[in-house]
């Protein structure tokens, strides 16, 4: 599957939107990609999970588990781990969830042994904040992050993720704006909070 095909999957599923959107980062964008609309389809999830697991294998990584930030990364982490488990010994899937104080935490049932390696997965990276909070939650339990993998990398700067190897199925850059930077053509559109 080519990079163009990944974007086509979003469009075909009605998961690529044009308008004016307030992103989780607080920035505004003329585009929004709603991965849950796409990933509710098992065939799309299997295809994307397969591409991501192949990227991980091609990079020579052999994680003990895959972690995704809740909610969007939960099914993705499971599917990537499932497909990696066809090649590697029992790769687990876990998720990190909000802890109520701006960070993330793991459920008690997700035991991480010190030194276990993991890859963190995400659907769309805009700032990387959610993924970084998930990584830090696992590192706080003794896990060692050996890579990051996403479907779409929208970041225009490496930012806080620069210390980790990143793999993506597609890089897609379009401008985002702070509220005081929104150009007139975009300001004319109704703002949709997502």
Curated annotation (Swiss-Prot):
Keywords: Glycosyltransferase, Magnesium, Pyrimidine biosynthesis, Transferase
Pfam families: Pribosyltran
InterPro entries per the UniProt record, alphabetical: OPRT, Orotate_PRibTrfase_bac, PRibTrfase_dom, PRTase-like
Positions that bind orotate: 126, 154
Annotated positions binding 5-phospho-alpha-D-ribose 1-diphosphate: 98, 122-130
Broad EC category: transferase
One GO MF term attached to the UniProt entry: orotate phosphoribosyltransferase activity
Keyword hit for tRNA-binding: no
GO biological process, one term: pyrimidine nucleobase biosynthetic process
Functional pathway: Pyrimidine metabolism; UMP biosynthesis via de novo pathway; UMP from orotate: step 1/2
EC number: 2.4.2.10
Membrane-crossing residue ranges in chain numbering: none
Annotated SUPFAM superfamilies: PRTase-like
HAMAP family membership: PyrE
Subunit organization: Homodimer.
Record family assignment: Belongs to the purine/pyrimidine phosphoribosyltransferase family. PyrE subfamily.
Function field: Catalyzes the transfer of a ribosyl phosphate group from 5-phosphoribose 1-diphosphate to orotate, leading to the formation of orotidine monophosphate (OMP).
Name of the protein in its database record: Orotate phosphoribosyltransferase
Species in which this protein is naturally found: Deinococcus radiodurans (strain ATCC 13939 / DSM 20539 / JCM 16871 / CCUG 27074 / LMG 4051 / NBRC 15346 / NCIMB 9279 / VKM B-1422 / R1)
Gene symbol of the encoding locus: pyrE
């Amino acid at each position: 599957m080519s990079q163009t095909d990944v974007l086509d999957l979003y469009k075909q599923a009605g998961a690529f939107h044009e308008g004016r959107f307030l992103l989780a980062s607080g920035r505004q964008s003329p585009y929004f990609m709603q991965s849950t609309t796409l990933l509710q389809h098992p065939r799309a999830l299997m295809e994307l999970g397969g591409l991501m697991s192949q990227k991980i294998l091609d990079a020579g990584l052999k994680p003990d588990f895959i972690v995704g930030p809740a909610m969007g990364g939960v099914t993705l982490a499971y599917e990537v781990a499932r497909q990696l488990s066809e090649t590697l010994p029992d790769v687990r899937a876990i998720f990190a969830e909000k802890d109520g104080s701006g960070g993330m935490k793991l459920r008690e049932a997700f035991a991480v042994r010190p030194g276990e390696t993991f890859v963190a997965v995400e659907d769309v990276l805009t700032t990387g904040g959610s993924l970084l909070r998930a990584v830090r939650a696992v590192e706080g339990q003794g896990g060692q992050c050996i890579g990051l993998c996403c479907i779409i990398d929208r970041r225009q700067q490496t930012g806080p993720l620069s210390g980790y190897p990143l793999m993506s199925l597609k890089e897609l850059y379009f401008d985002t704006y702070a509220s005081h930077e929104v150009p007139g053509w975009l300001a004319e559109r109704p703002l949709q909070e997502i």
